[in-house]
């Protein structure tokens, strides 16, 4: 049985099921030029709402059977001049029946282009671009009168492309841990291909480039007024390093296995160190090693607790880069986003820092729905690189009301030296006065675990920095493809996650940090779920990031919001530099839901998950003309 085309994306917060997604394209007809609202001037100074509509399956791929009641849609999608424009316009008309020029936002759409799905296998076994499919995609841009974000995507999530199995059979296309090439994995109901980006000299990259070039060539044959509808191009989708057990392996537990340890990556790491330090003696001074040359350096790959090391610099685990998370959750009756509870951390009786209780914890809400709020998470990263070896005592307090501390618990941890000497308890200082938790407080300390040990290896942060640079280099390689085309002047964006907004995730596994910093010629594109969509955490990070303009490539508050609150969210992001905002929407033909594998995160009047039905209505009312 053919499965519906449903690539998925990694969402912040620990979801209980996978997002069945994909998007854009179905049914276009030139008659919609006169039925739809007139296009706005290019690059209007409004926030562009660019929902990703699940129209790929029924129109662009033509793999889904349409019910008899939608017989009139088929020819628009699949005819000689078929496109997804008719279904795009029908869906957007349901969201905004009449244009509203005075609105603070403009309504367009995102057209995702599944790069590896653009290939078909010939009778000779060779793979060629499906020109008909490319034509339907590009005609969508031509036939739909609205502004669009062109999303050129190829991620580790399967797009159910036939060529994927062929590419995965070549080890040079797959990411490698220290144990060798990663195979395929699963993320809930989606297949994961652990592609590498440590090199561009493989067939995976060649095919991606071939597909991008085919789309760009076709787009560049459009009339200038049609090309002008393209407000932005997003590159590849979520690009980050990978690890085994992708569904459950995002945290700090278990053996530390990350990509990429291929020969190309190891050679690249040595070049990276040579460029950074110049002389091997300088590297040796920094990391405390005795390498004779850069060619002797190997990436850290062993755990000192369980494996013999030839050099100490071979050690790696989730904490060897020099920080450890102190994290957990807390629910305080009466706390609000404006007046949150605070967590204070003390080390050996000395104050370390405090953090607001505000991070999303969908797992806590699922276990305790009576809280009615997922934003119960907290985390402080403790830098232990310069701490003396020995036993340290961490005490965690909750400040539920100003000045009133409640003691949540104590954790003894061992900061170890290279010789693994037996740690001794360090001197302690008096703790502040505190009271035991009352009935109005529920809380838990997730990490660190009692009596945990920590080893700092100064080579590990260099390894992670190199891995992060690999992400940037691969993005730049594909950015250059677009920059050489007729779309060179169209803004280009990343499409990245921000793993640090989930307090239970190890951001260094993903090594995504460098791609979130300002990149010459590439604007920030981020996927926001939960509190970062409407709360303060994302804007705090944005203020430190150096970014001035950005796109929101995926958006879901993970809770219902009324119209006024939704408008405030749109306005706030626009004030902070957001240029477009995309959320998933299910396709509707003349008001009826089009059958497909529906996305649990779609804003849709029939989807009650995460308040998505109410979010749809709120956006609908925000886009409606004011009542008279």
Regions found by a protein language model. Name each.
Residues 376-389, 400:
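Signal that preferentially marks extracellular ectodomain short beta-strand elements
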Residues 69-86, 113-129, 189-211, 456-472, ...:
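The substrate-binding groove and active-site-proximal loops of carbohydrate-active enzymes
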Residues 13-27:
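Hydrophobic membrane-insertion alpha-helices, especially the h-region
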Residues 32-113:
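Boundary/entry segment of secreted carbohydrate-active catalytic domains
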Residues 169-358, 389-394, 401-485, 491-509:
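Polysaccharide-binding and catalytic clefts of secreted carbohydrate-active enzymes
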Residues 54, 147-159, 231, 237-238, ...:
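Substrate-binding cleft of secreted/luminal carbohydrate-active enzymes
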Residues 361-382:
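Aromatic sugar-binding surface patches on proteins
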Residues 81-188, 199-206, 210, 216-221, ...:
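Aromatic-lined substrate-binding rim segments of carbohydrate-active enzymes
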